[in-house]
Amino acid sequence: MLSWLAKRLISWVMSRTRAGDIRPTLALDAPDMSFVFPGSNSWSGAYHGRDSHRRWLERLVRVGVMTDVDEVVAGGFPWAMTACIRGRSWWDNRAGERIYDNRYVIWAKLRWGRIIEYEVYEDTEKAQALDDYMEANEPALMAS
């Protein structure tokens, strides 16, 4: 039941982000949350605090990378909950050609309904290939 509810919530939150509204995502963040996106591409880094996460999300929306949820597994007590989210992310160029198509897993820790930390695992070579494409074809999107 908990996983079902978590999937409904996260699916709605991600649908809002796809629509350009990051407020629901930020509402789930604890003020001192931490977010890690491994790799060596323009998306990679360790981000601390809601404001840092907001800037990362603003770029995601500005660039137009889309995310969706396939499955959520959630467990634990309200003061020490873990959520694992499996989904996909993609980006189409202006001609409608799918340039980026990736799978991800998010491992998140929550306390009282707020995300305190999460890490995204995905094929970082695909993220680098997106960077390479944007640098060659859409350089304005590379600006942070």
Regions found by a protein language model. Name each.
Residues M1-L5, E58-S144:
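A beta-strand edge to alpha-helix "cap/lid" segment located at domain peripheries
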Residues M1-P31, A136-S144:
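Short, low-complexity N-terminal intrinsically disordered segments enriched in polar/charged residues
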Residues I10, H53, T82-A83:
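A general structural signal for well-ordered alpha-helical segments in protein cores
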Residues W12-S15, W43, E117:
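Short, flexible active-site loop motifs that bind/organize anionic cofactors or intermediates
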Residues A19-D21, L26, S40, N93, ...:
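Preference for short coil/turn "hinge" residues that link or interrupt alpha-helices
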Residues R23-G76:
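A solvent-exposed, acidic/Ser-Thr-rich amphipathic alpha-helical stretch
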